[in-house]
Amino acid sequence: MRQIIYDKVKYIADKYKGYIDTEDLMKEGLTNRQIGLLTAEGKLDKVAHGHYWIISPEFSKPEDYKAVEVARVNRKAVICADSACYYMGLIDKEPEILSIATRRSDRHKMKMNFEVSRHYFSEQAFEDEKHVFDTKYGSYNVYGIDRSVCDCIRFREDIDKDIFELVIENYRKYDKKNEERLMAYAKAMRIGRQVERIGLDR
């Protein structure tokens, strides 16, 4: 490719400093063919359909890049279950698979460069206890700790055993837990007896 294209990529990197969509790349004068070639050459990292990370020695991806990238693909998706417990600080080990929640009616494709476990929620359950994390790369949604612990029990078969045990152990010691809120959510999700058997109030 001609040097003028590489100069343009450097200009784009300086301007956007990270994530950029196909639409903006084309607004900056790149063609689909050039975008494909730049991706093959390692100048662009395709994080999902229509979304890229500009590779530059001057900056690197944020630690929470998985959450940021999911939100760029589907801004209404919510980090849930074990992953939410990590982002909310209950556990310090990041699950390898990112757990995300979407509405049952959500038809967004969530094909990412990393593995995700997608869970579908009813309208009412989807809206409960959402927190918004604002970053310079955009915002993303995360469920609160009490409901996320409950979701871990609900989706136990989809969660790494060691991560699940860490969530339960840490929640038992968590001094800000709201058992009333957790049990209300558990009963609404029809897993009240499962939660009681585990004994989160020890």
Question: Predicted segment positions?
Answer:
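FIC/Doc superfamily catalytic core
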Residues: M1-Y6, R33
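Nucleic-acid-binding surface
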Residues: I4-K8, Y19-D24, T39, I54-R202
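Basic, Lys/Arg-rich alpha-helical nucleic-acid-recognition elements, primarily the DNA-binding modules
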Residues: D7-Y16, L44
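Polyanion-binding surface elements
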Residues: A13-L30
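Glycine-rich phosphate/ribose-binding loops and adjacent secondary-structure elements
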Residues: E28, H51-W53
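Short amphipathic alpha-helical interaction segments
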Residues: E28-A40
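A short, conserved structural fragment
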Residues: G42-H49
